[in-house]
Amino acid sequence: EQFPLKDTSVSTTINGVIAETYVTQTYTNEGQNPINASYVFPASARVTVHGMKMEIGDEVITAKIREKEEAKTEFEEAKSEGKSASLLEQQRPNVFTMNVANVMPGDTVRIELHYTELISSRDGVYQFVFPTVTGPRYASPSPENSGQDEWVASPYLEEGTAPQGTYDIAVNLSTGVPISSLTSSSHKIKVEKESESIAHVTLSDSGEFA
């Protein structure tokens, strides 16, 4: 069955060394049957997830924090009753997965994720990374965890390959100190500086790779 990613929108505000990010992604079940899907979101080990919301048609499902086993039980019950449901879990310090149950043919699923992240520096350079897909660096199975690594089979794009669907990202940056330079190693970007320490960064109109 086909469940392609149609659109990704990322809005990030960086104040000092804290980045607050809102991610919205849209998928559509283009198959002929109901499906259960697994959504994999790679992130740094310094990420804290604050909220997740899923919209399927007119139905809105908002995540609530539960003990792991209790959450799994509630998810399986909803799944067995044919209800749309989702379960967000942290599989590793840097990988979150969300299981989505009973997505009907033609349904469009909109997922909203809200998280904050501590930005670290290396040699005086601060780097913010938003991964478009999971890849080998995020999904390397280890022998001691081989029984828990089924999720690592998630497909990924080779370096330099454009992600599926439309993609845009906007970063509002307030550093508190003068910004010496702003660059992207992956994409061509457009930078608008409001002052020495405040800037707005978006992808260039072409969305080309750097």
Question: Where are these predicted regions, by residue range?
Answer:
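Subset of Sec-pathway N-terminal targeting signals
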Residues: 1-210
